[in-house]
């Protein structure tokens, strides 16, 4: 019996395992309405403009579900913020919401998020379980991207189309 346990233990310790883990491609945005001070622009309450959103890259899963990392889909986006706005890009977050309210693969978080900021651009990437190409749903949906400040004021949306490449 003790040899059985020893051999079983050795087998489990020597089994090759693959794991997949992505660091989030975004950070939480902390709203603080009770500590927020409204900013003025030429004597008028400053509004949040529509961000300029660019789809940098869409990567589809290439392996069967359960494969390590290769079944993940990724969407890389950039949001450019106007330098002329009274709110700095460090003071705002962004909501990503499917235009019809239904995110087909739960790609985007339900809360406002911040991206990795460089100059006046925030970079994001979103990961979802995409699976083998044989079983993938076609990507073709619209996403509204809203800026939000710490007082939970929401700006005008930019609408982008997430669509898989043709051919």
Where in the sequence are the language-model features?
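Sec-dependent N-terminal signal peptides
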Residues: 4-13
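Short, compositionally biased P/S/T/A/G/V-rich stretches that sit at domain boundaries
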Residues: 20-81, 166-167
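Solvent-exposed loop/turn segments flanking beta-strands in beta-repeat/beta-sandwich domains
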Residues: 80-109
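Solvent-exposed serine/threonine-rich low-complexity stretches and specific carbohydrate-binding patches
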Residues: 104-120, 160-161
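Signal that preferentially marks extracellular ectodomain short beta-strand elements
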Residues: 121-135
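Exposed beta-strand face motif in extracellular beta-rich ectodomains
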Residues: 137-143
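Extracellular fibronectin type III
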Residues: 151-165
């Amino acid at each position: 019996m003790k040899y059985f346990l020893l051999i079983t233990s050795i087998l489990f310790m020597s089994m090759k395992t693959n794991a997949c883990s992505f660091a989030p491609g975004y950070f939480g945005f902390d709203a603080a309405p009770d500590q927020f001070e409204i900013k003025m622009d030429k004597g008028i309450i400053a509004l949040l403009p529509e961000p300029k959103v660019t789809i940098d890259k869409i990567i589809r899963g290439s392996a069967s579900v359960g494969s390590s990392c290769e079944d993940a889909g990724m969407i890389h986006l950039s949001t450019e913020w106007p330098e002329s706005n009274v709110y700095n890009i460090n003071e705002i977050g962004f909501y990503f919401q499917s235009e019809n309210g239904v995110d087909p693969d739960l790609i985007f978080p339900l809360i406002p998020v911040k991206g990795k900021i460089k100059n006046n651009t925030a970079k994001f990437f979103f990961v979802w379980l995409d699976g083998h190409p044989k079983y993938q749903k076609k990507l073709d949906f619209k996403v509204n991207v809203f800026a939000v400040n710490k007082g939970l004021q929401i700006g005008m949306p930019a609408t982008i189309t997430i669509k898989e490449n043709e051919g």
